[in-house]
């Protein structure tokens, strides 16, 4: 059975009207989860010590200090804080860390964290692209530094490159980071020559308009061999579903069945120990359908 971590506080991050990263995304995720036998757990409130594995204390203090008493505070062109944003982000951090703990200790084989705001664009001292804290990078560092794993891997299939995760783990020789993403597209990073300090970063750009066939080719030809060579003890997934053909923010042509195939193949690595965390996905119906197949596979492979 798959563990699913959620918390009502993740709905406290409220974005301005018309913003694509909106609270209704959580309801879409719940529609996707309907009918799947999952074990639900609440995300604990994150430990600041885990955040500090990736972000300096001055950044943490700056985010907390910027939270408004009402309305919104704007951190960059599309990243906002509302009164409940810090609380929501810390629940997402707590969820990824609790999921890592459960999977690493053998309590479960697979887990999915349905938190928000997303995290893969957040750099060490910069909030950007809807993201405050580098949630999945924090989870990887917990696996490495708290559980003393020797090798972990992250696969990020969000349509936008995970520049934050890349920056946070650029010098981390124990973590393989693999990103497939549309290029050119925001944030403009993710070229193949961006390899990390130890050659442990693999960027696989995809052209606008490409679909499931092109995705399968690059995963079979590049991503899966990299994972096999790395032999990770834990696989984390930055699960953004905005490469779907119906997503309004990009131009890839994936379908829900592509996420089913990809999730199933990713579960072949790390002995099937997989922790997935929600990132993007902004068409609500496409998000629900994609979450349904993604978590459905995690449930099947977690038995």
Language model segments and positions:
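HDAC/HDAC-like amidohydrolase catalytic core signature
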Residues: 1-155, 159-303
């Amino acid at each position: 059975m798959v563990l699913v971590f959620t918390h009502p506080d993740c709905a406290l991050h409220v974005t301005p009207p018309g913003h694509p990263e909106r609270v209704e995304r959580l309801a879409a995720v719940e529609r996707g989860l309907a009918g799947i036998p999952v074990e639900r757990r609440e995300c604990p409130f994150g430990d600041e010590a885990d955040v500090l594995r990736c972000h300096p204390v001055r950044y943490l203090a700056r985010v907390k200090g910027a939270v408004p008493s009402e309305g919104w505070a704007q951190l960059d062109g599309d990243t906002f804080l509302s009164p409940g944003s810090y609380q929501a982000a810390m629940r997402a951090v707590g969820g990824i860390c609790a999921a890592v703990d459960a999977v690493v200790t053998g309590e479960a084989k697979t887990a999915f964290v349905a938190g928000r705001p997303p995290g893969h664009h957040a750099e060490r001292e910069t909030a950007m692209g809807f993201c405050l804290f580098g949630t999945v990078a924090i989870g990887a560092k917990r696996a490495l530094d708290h559980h003393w794993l020797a090798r972990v891997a992250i696969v990020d299939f969000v349509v936008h490159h995970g520049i934050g995760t890349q920056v946070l783990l650029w010098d981390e020789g124990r973590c393989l980071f693999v990103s497939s993403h549309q290029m050119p597209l925001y944030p403009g990073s993710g070229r193949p020559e961006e390899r990390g300090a130890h050659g442990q970063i693999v960027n696989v750009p995809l052209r606008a308009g490409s679909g499931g066939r092109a995705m399968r080719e690059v995963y079979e030809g590049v991503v899966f061999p990299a994972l096999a060579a790395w032999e990770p003890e834990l696989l984390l997934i930055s699960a953004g579903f905005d490469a779907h053909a119906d997503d309004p923010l990009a131009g890839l042509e994936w379908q829900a069945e592509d996420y089913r195939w990809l999730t199933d193949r990713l579960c072949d690595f790390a002995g099937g120990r997989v922790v997935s965390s929600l990132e993007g996905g902004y068409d609500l119906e496409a998000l629900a359908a994609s979450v349904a197949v993604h978590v459905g596979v995690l449930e099947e492979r977690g038995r």
